[in-house]
A protein has these predicted regions:
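Serine-esterase "nucleophile elbow" of acetyl-processing enzymes
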Residues: 29-89, 140-145
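Structural recognition of the beta-strand scaffold that forms the well-ordered cores
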Residues: 37-42, 46-48, 81-86, 118-123, ...
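A structural motif corresponding to the C-terminal end of an alpha-helix
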Residues: 71-78, 174-193, 229-250
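Charged, often glycine-rich, active-site loop that binds/positions anionic groups
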Residues: 88-107, 260-276
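Catalytic His-Asp segment of secreted/periplasmic serine-dependent ester chemistry enzymes
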Residues: 198-302
């Protein structure tokens, strides 16, 4: 049970986000009954956003995303017990799109958070700007798919990749703290977790391999910077979770050995079974999402 002092601290910290989170004329009430069991916030790795998909809210989500597979296996799919506000291009706080604050506001407006909420899962950070560099990891045309200049350790200095040196646990924790505090206050019984990213490319190697439609197999021989960024983000999420007193779901460990171009890849290309109506290249495929859903269900007892 959370102490009164803890709740007072949370209330003070919530002032700024509450102004954004509540629709006009709505009164905030902590611990509302009848909230969602499972709430998910995230980006395209969460939504597995189809390249050619469409949704009324502008955030297409594949039936094969790990949240949808999780909801189906727990019989929450199609019920008020499951709220997924993840969106392609979602960020922690970069840009004016579906940041975590915007997603939290959207979920709160749907009555997602309350004393009945059991798990709130947050997967974000890959699309954000880090440090002095204005570069982003996605879209990848400025770096990962630039065969001429590559995506080496100098890419961040050239604003073609986030500054991986700036990706730390303390910085990550500071950027998500407001949302985590809000969730803890309005869903006091929920287990809150940062969800990591899958093994996109094997760590510790200089090159990155991708299977793309028409083009075929593409190898970026200078991908040290991109892979370093993925490694730093993994470490930062784990450390941030510890600093915030929440959980970390190590998706990289779950998907180890199934990187892009492996014998059994769980990272999609854009051909065959990896339909543009189902997902995006260099994103999780149905098999990878299924494995994550199974592990998350077991861990959180859903």
């Amino acid at each position: 049970m959370r102490s009164v002092r803890g709740r007072s601290t949370a209330t003070a910290a919530l002032v700024a986000i509450s102004l954004l989170a509540l629709p006009s004329g709505t009164t905030a009430t902590a611990d509302p009954a009848g909230a969602a069991t499972l709430v998910v916030l995230g980006d395209s790795f969460t939504a597995t956003a189809p390249v050619l998909g469409h949704a009324d809210d502008g955030c297409a989500r594949s039936p094969n995303s790990w949240p949808n597979k999780l909801a189906t296996s727990t019989r929450l799919s199609g019920t008020a017990g499951f709220v997924d506000v993840s969106c392609n291009g979602g960020t922690i706080d970069t840009g004016n799109g579906w940041t975590l604050v915007h997603q939290t506001r959207k979920a709160h407006a749907q009555g997602a958070f309350g004393s009945d909420t059991r798990a709130v899962l947050i997967q974000a950070g890959l699309n954000d700007i880090w440090g002095a560099s204005s570069g982003t990891a996605f879209p990848s045309t400025d770096c990962l798919l630039d065969i001429v200049e590559g995506c080496g350790l100098d890419a961040a200095e050239q604003n073609r990749l986030p500054d991986y040196h700036a990706v730390t646990g303390a910085t990550y924790a500071d950027r998500v703290r407001e949302v985590v505090t809000f969730v803890r206050y309005y869903a006091p019984n929920a287990r809150v977790a940062l969800v990591g990213y899958p093994e996109i490319f094997p760590p510790g190697q200089p090159a990155a391999c991708m299977d793309l439609a028409v083009v075929g197999r593409v190898v970026q021989p200078r991908a040290e910077g991109y892979i370093a960024y993925l490694d730093r983000l993994q470490d930062a999420q784990r450390a941030a979770a510890q600093l915030l007193g929440i959980e970390f779901v190590d998706v990289r460990a779950i998907t180890a050995g199934h990187a892009s171009c492996s014998e059994e890849p769980w990272i999609s290309g854009l051909a065959g079974a990896d339909s543009p109506f189902d997902g995006a290249p260099v994103h999780p495929n149905a098999q990878g999402n299924g494995a994550v859903a199974v592990q998350v269900r077991q861990r959180f007892g859903l």
